């Protein structure tokens, strides 16, 4: 009888283990499928938005001028703030862009993040996956279909944020009860959830009420900058020097920053409890790779924009061809890095050495690109150099991350910041080339600073970040060598 019970118990344990293993494998398959589907949709969304950027992101629309947010089918007046008419049109374009972009990016990133957190409970997360994807798709489609120039209609886009908040609220409640079972120590306290949701609601309320007040305090809801008391009051606060206005500004920014911090209480709680580990950051890098892939494909399209005065000379301007050598230099650096890295793999290597090699390579690339762009005035040359160099930089990052499995979380976060900066630089160069094309003739990014344009500022920032990192590593490397030498001297003295 005892043997029969023991045999039954053993069978039960084996069955439970097999069932659990099958469930994990099934959840892993579903998770990988959803991640692949989301990746394909994300890449498609970004590629289409960028290829049709002048029509979608800048609001030119499709078809005749009646379906455009600009007066003419050109971006020549984009960010022209010299008249109330252009000021209002540009404000509405920027407002539309920020609302739709925020909703699109937030929902896509949220889905990628949640797929990581719910690897074991993926089936239960499926409804939220679909709903977040639906909101992302709506935002994407509105970029292609919504081109209203009426303030009230454009301001109605904020209600997308209300829908997003309600979805977030339902997800956070679901996540709290699910995570409470798997990680009771971290999710035992529901106060963080309540604080985050309350302050998110207050921020949303501010975003919704502000446009409503704006359009209802003027003589006409169709005019935002003419005979509008709200606009006049805002201008006075920022321009009229008085103690009252100073206190209002300080109080506004203080409460805004406080509300933003408290609205992200859950995030800070996870950071403090070290839930954002190396694997989580690597998961984020996948989204960055998708974004870079879209930028890479789009830049190939950007080369097609006509610049009659920017054609490359055929043998009559040797200096320009010297500038283009930056691209060949970047490729040579990549080859040398790959050869050196492969050679090092055959011998024992330290993580500090490999990191130093990475940072030196990135610093050389960012410095050479900045210097060439600083002295070169041809947009097409800058576009070629940036296109090649950033591709090399991202390739170097990819090689380093692929070959080093035990990168610290802090370093991964820093590399992530540098990658985002590289992508932003590439996007700005692409948009600058689009705006300065013959059809649009807009030099917005070139007129921000008298001595340096926005592209050069971004490249300088990229170099500065790499230079700061290499300075830190050089000091750390010197300290390690000093400690080793000191230890060797002590050992030699003991032997004597």
Swiss-Prot record:
Membrane topology is:
Multi-pass membrane protein
One GO cellular component term of this record is: plasma membrane
Q: Which cysteines are joined by disulfide bonds?
A: none
Q: Does the keyword Membrane apply?
A: yes
Transmembrane regions:
33-53, 89-109, 127-147, 154-174, 193-213, 247-267, 285-305, 320-340, 355-375, 382-402, 411-431, 455-475
Tell whether Repressor is among the UniProt keywords. no
Question: Subcellular location, in the record's words?
Answer: Cell membrane
Q: What's in the keyword line of the UniProt record?
A: Cell membrane, Membrane, Transmembrane, Transmembrane helix
What name does UniProt use for this protein?
Answer: Uncharacterized protein UU048
Organism per entry:
Ureaplasma parvum serovar 3 (strain ATCC 700970)
């Amino acid at each position: 009888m005892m043997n029969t019970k023991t045999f039954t118990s053993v069978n039960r344990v084996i069955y439970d283990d097999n069932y659990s293993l099958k469930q994990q494998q099934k959840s892993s398959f579903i998770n990988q499928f959803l991640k692949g589907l989301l990746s394909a949709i994300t890449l498609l969304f970004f590629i289409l938005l960028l290829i049709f950027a002048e029509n979608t992101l800048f609001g030119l629309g499709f078809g005749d001028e009646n379906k455009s947010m600009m007066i003419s089918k050109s971006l020549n007046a984009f960010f022209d703030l010299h008249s109330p008419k252009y000021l209002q049109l540009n404000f509405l374009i920027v407002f539309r862009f920020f609302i739709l972009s925020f909703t699109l990016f937030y929902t896509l990133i949220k889905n990628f993040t949640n797929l990581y957190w719910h690897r074991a409970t993926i089936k239960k997360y499926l409804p939220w996956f679909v709903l977040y994807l639906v909101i992302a798709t709506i935002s994407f489609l509105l970029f292609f279909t919504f081109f209203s120039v009426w303030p009230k209609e454009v301001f109605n886009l904020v209600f997308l944020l209300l829908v997003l908040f309600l979805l977030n609220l339902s997800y956070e409640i679901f996540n709290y009860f699910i995570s409470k079972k798997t990680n009771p120590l971290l999710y035992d306290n529901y106060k963080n959830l309540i604080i985050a949701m309350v302050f998110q609601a207050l921020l949303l309320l501010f975003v919704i009420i502000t446009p409503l007040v704006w359009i209802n305090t003027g003589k006409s809801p169709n005019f935002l900058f003419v005979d509008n008391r709200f606009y006049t009051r805002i201008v006075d606060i920022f321009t009229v020097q008085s103690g009252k206005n100073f206190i209002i500004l300080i109080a506004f920014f203080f409460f805004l920053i406080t509300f933003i911090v408290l609205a992200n209480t859950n995030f800070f709680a996870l950071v403090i409890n070290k839930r954002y580990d190396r694997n989580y950051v690597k998961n984020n890098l996948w989204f960055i790779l998708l974004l870079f892939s879209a930028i890479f494909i789009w830049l190939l399209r950007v080369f097609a924009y006509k610049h009659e005065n920017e054609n490359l000379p055929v043998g009559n301007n040797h200096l320009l061809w010297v500038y283009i050598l930056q691209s060949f230099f970047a490729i040579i650096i990549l080859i040398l890095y790959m050869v050196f890295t492969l050679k090092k793999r055959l011998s024992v290597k330290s993580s500090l050495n490999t990191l130093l090699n990475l940072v030196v390579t990135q610093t050389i690339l960012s410095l050479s690109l900045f210097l060439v762009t600083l002295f070169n005035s041809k947009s097409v040359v800058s576009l070629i150099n940036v296109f090649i160099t950033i591709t090399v930089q991202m390739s170097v990052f990819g090689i380093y991350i692929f070959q080093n499995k035990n990168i610290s979380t802090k370093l991964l976060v820093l590399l992530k910041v540098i990658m985002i900066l590289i992508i932003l630089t590439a996007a700005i160069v692409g948009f600058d080339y689009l705006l300065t094309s013959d059809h649009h003739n807009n030099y917005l990014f070139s007129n921000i600073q008298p001595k340096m344009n926005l592209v050069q500022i971004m490249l300088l920032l990229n170099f500065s970040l790499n230079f700061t990192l290499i300075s830190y590593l050089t000091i750390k490397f010197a300290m390690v060598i000093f400690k080793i030498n000191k230890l060797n001297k002590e050992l030699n003295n003991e032997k004597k």
